[in-house]
A protein has these predicted regions:
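Generic alpha-helical structural context detector
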Residues: 41, 49-53, 83-86, 90-93
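Conserved, charged catalytic cores of large soluble enzymes
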Residues: 85-124, 144, 148-165, 169
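Short, charged/polar, low-complexity loop and linker segments
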Residues: 61-66, 119-126
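Short acidic/His/Gly/Ser-rich catalytic and metal-binding motifs that mark active-site loops
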Residues: 22, 59-61, 81, 149-153, ...
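Conserved small/polar residues in nucleotide/adenosyl-binding loops
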Residues: 180-187
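Alpha-helical recognition segments enriched in aromatics with Gly/Pro capping
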Residues: 1-67
């Protein structure tokens, strides 16, 4: 039809594999269809988008179940991302009234986190260029998990109890607050 209308043919056409409900193809006749509107009503559009990008690759069949959706949202969005945001805001407000300055009292663990944060956007973008959204999200969530681990390793709540460690505390909080304000974080979260 395009040729008959003298319209150029597409250079690239994206197709997708089957969307499965558990192990079976979704089918109205089987009664195992999960409707996107129902998912959005319950979980919200962003959580559903995240799930679809993470669990349903372009090059393989993707499976969706209510249990899998709840598990992914709880493990990644609530436990990893939500926990990190909550910890960051709570400690920044509690120890520095929400204004954290870099006192530059650095240790090796700080540089490791910074290096990971700087490398992550390039890795995530490369995965997106390969149409591997799930792998791009894995790169982002690896950084978020590492940041949660960084908080556990640096123990800001212990540093806060020692007035002589106040500058180190400020550096630690600054490092994980920086992830949300840097150009690198801005680019990666846009991915």
């Amino acid at each position: 039809m395009l040729m008959a209308l003298d319209i150029p043919l597409p250079k690239q056409v994206f197709g997708h594999p089957w969307l499965l409900q558990g192990e079976s193809k979704m089918s109205k006749s089987k009664g195992n269809v999960i409707y996107a509107d129902d998912l959005v009503d319950i979980f919200g559009v962003d959580a559903v988008r995240y799930f679809v990008l993470h669990e349903i690759p372009y090059d393989n069949d993707g499976s969706i179940t209510w249990d899998l959706l709840v598990e992914r949202i709880n493990s990644d969005l609530a436990n990893v991302l939500g926990n990190l945001v909550n910890r960051t805001i709570a400690m920044s407000n509690k120890y520095f009234d929400g204004i954290v300055e870099n006192k530059n009292i650095c240790e090796d663990v700080d540089q490791e986190l910074k290096d990971l944060a700087l490398a992550m956007p390039g890795k995530a973008i490369a995965k997106m260029d390969e149409l591997k959204a799930s792998n791009a999200l894995d790169e982002i969530f690896n950084l978020l998990r590492r940041t949660n681990k960084y908080i556990d390793e640096t123990m800001p709540w212990v540093l806060a109890k020692d007035e002589t460690k106040k500058d180190r505390l400020a550096t630690v909080l600054y490092n994980f607050c920086l992830l949300y304000t840097s150009d690198a974080a801005d680019d990666s979260l846009r991915v």
